[in-house]
């Protein structure tokens, strides 16, 4: 899993 921040909003991306 990878956590990225978009507009200061944490989002978890599952490949």
Curated annotation (Swiss-Prot):
GO terms for biological process: defense response to fungus; killing of cells of another organism. One of its GO terms (cellular component) is extracellular region. This is Thaumatin-like protein. Belongs to the thaumatin family. The keyword Zinc does not apply. It is found in: Secreted. Keywords: Antimicrobial, Fungicide, Secreted. It comes from Castanopsis chinensis. Has antifungal activity against B.cinerea, F.oxysporum, M.arachidicola and P.piricola. Inhibits HIV-1 reverse transcriptase. Its main location: secreted. It comes from the Eukaryota. The keyword Secreted applies.
């Amino acid at each position: 899993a990878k956590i990225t921040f978009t507009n200061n909003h944490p989002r978890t991306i599952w490949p």
